[in-house]
Structures are given as C-alpha cells and as structure tokens.
C-alpha cells in the first residue's frame, strides 16, 4: 500500500505534520504513523489555551499495538483541538491530513519549522527510498 504525504505540509522525524496558514499551525500525525499504530483507540490532546513547546510531549495516542507520545513540532498556544477525533479516535485512520487533525496552534516562532522535512524528504526517511 502506498501512503500519501501531501506536499503542502511539513513533517517531523517523530511523524507529526504541520500545515501552516499564516500564524496558525494545524498539527496531526502522518499516514505512516497511523499505519504503524494500527487501530487507534484513544487520543489525548491539550485543551484550548494551553501552551505547547517545540520538541515537548503535547499528548498521547493509544492503539491496540502501542501507546505513543505526540511531540510538538512548534511552540505556541492551542487555539482549538479536534474534539471529534478525541471522541471517535478510530476515525483518524480515514483522513489523517483532513478531518483527522489533532490541534491548531497559534505559533510563537515560525522559524522553528526551518528544519522540518518536506514531503519527499519524509517519504525517503520512512520508506527508505
């Protein structure tokens, strides 16, 4: 199965992605991470108004296979979390880049994304091509 990695996103080594629109970063996990985790049964993300710091844990995701930490790709303040995905985590697998986003953050320093991976760089890293 070939997994998708949209070109308009930035990717992290830890498998989170960022869609940047102005100073708002939409954060989720990549199709590779969803595929590796298997059936997702629980997601915990921060509440609106909470601060997150780049590289620090901002939540957890639990599947039938494992529990994984979510790492913040950027620093900022959570302005929205995806309660629909928290309430129905199994839906994440169907659309990780669309309806499956996790949090939206007002970023404090856009330069933090300087070292993020492009779609082709991320694909090469996870697929070894």
From Swiss-Prot:
Family as reported in the entry's similarity comment: Belongs to the GcvH family.
GO cellular component: cytosol; glycine cleavage complex
Domain Lipoyl-binding: 24-106
Cofactor binding description: Binds 1 lipoyl cofactor covalently.
Organism the protein comes from: Cyanothece sp. (strain PCC 7425 / ATCC 29141)
Superkingdom, taxonomy of origin: Bacteria
InterPro entries: 2-oxoA_DH_lipoyl-BS, Biotin_lipoyl, GCV_H, GCV_H/Fam206, GCV_H_sub, Single_hybrid_motif
Keywords, sorted A to Z: Lipoyl
Function as written in the Swiss-Prot or TrEMBL entry: The glycine cleavage system catalyzes the degradation of glycine. The H protein shuttles the methylamine group of glycine from the P protein to the T protein.
N6-lipoyllysine: residues bearing it: 65
Name of encoding gene: gcvH
One of the protein's GO biological processes: glycine decarboxylation via glycine cleavage system
Cofactor(s) needed by this chain: (R)-lipoate
Gene3D superfamilies from the UniProt entry: 2.40.50.100
Subunit note: The glycine cleavage system is composed of four proteins: P, T, L and H.
Protein name: Glycine cleavage system H protein
